[in-house]
Amino acid sequence: MAAIVDQIRLENKKSIIRLVAGDITERAVDAIVNAANSYLKHGGGVADAIVRKGGEIIQEESDKIGFVPVGCSVITTSGRLP
């Protein structure tokens, strides 16, 4: 079971960031931000867990995107994630 470890309210007073302990693939969230290699090959760590739980569609979408320079970001669907 996930538990909130800490949280902060941003200066705009409309946003809250929560630090939560638990399985990131089981949380209903707006987005997951995950560090990845430039070729978007999700073969280990958090990236692998996301693809295993969310489905191969996440890797397939990443393959279509291809190379991503360091410091840039991309968006995929969540697959079967909540």
Residue ranges of each PLM-predicted region?
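Macrodomain-like recognition of ADP-ribose-binding/processing modules
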Residues: 1-82
